[in-house]
């Protein structure tokens, strides 16, 4: 193991390294950052560390060869590598949407937009709604929920008449919480992920239109095993005229890009 890529984000630390010709990807809570570094030092005392991310300066790597890679550069290089490896390269220039604790939007190696809506909202507000702090459990609850019991839908407004717009659209996020007594924590989590997805998509779609592309690549730790969020992005493709691409290891794009960067 000669090079180790580390992406130290707001909530998670992602690690990428190659050993015996195989790439290994690991994810840890930022609270365990010091433990992770000690483990890596023991695992490969002669490796060079290629670090990126907003919390990279907190890494205690004194005495080791350390190279700091600009976060945007690492993310773009890692994404390009994964698109080729997974054979998902779009046919034209693409918008890159990185959904981590917050969300950043890139085009041609430039950050052109962003929002505080992302994984931090999912886990933070999710815990307030459900008293559950586990990301995995929150996603599982969302899978079991029915967001139409929490969200006021267009069809709820036009019950006895023809709707002028698609009746399956959201009229008001969480607009039915006080109206439907059967509304559950699972339903609220499903509604929360819908809100996050719709908000990110509206911003991303506007950014895509501004640079005249219909190709949007979604990456980031918040998409990991998060089928409900992916479904939001897939659902509106035809209606809003864009193509969504997801990467199996997109949550590690920054760590991979850092490892590969010279």
Swiss-Prot record:
Main location class: cytoplasm
Q: Which domain of life is it from?
A: Bacteria
Which controlled-vocabulary keywords does the entry list?
ATP-binding, Coenzyme A biosynthesis, Cytoplasm, Kinase, Nucleotide-binding, Transferase
Active-site positions on this chain:
71 (proton acceptor)
One BP term from GO: coenzyme A biosynthetic process
Q: Which SUPFAM superfamilies match?
A: Actin-like ATPase domain
What's this protein's family per the entry? Answer: Belongs to the type II pantothenate kinase family.
Q: What is this protein called?
A: Type II pantothenate kinase
- Gene encoding this chain? coaW
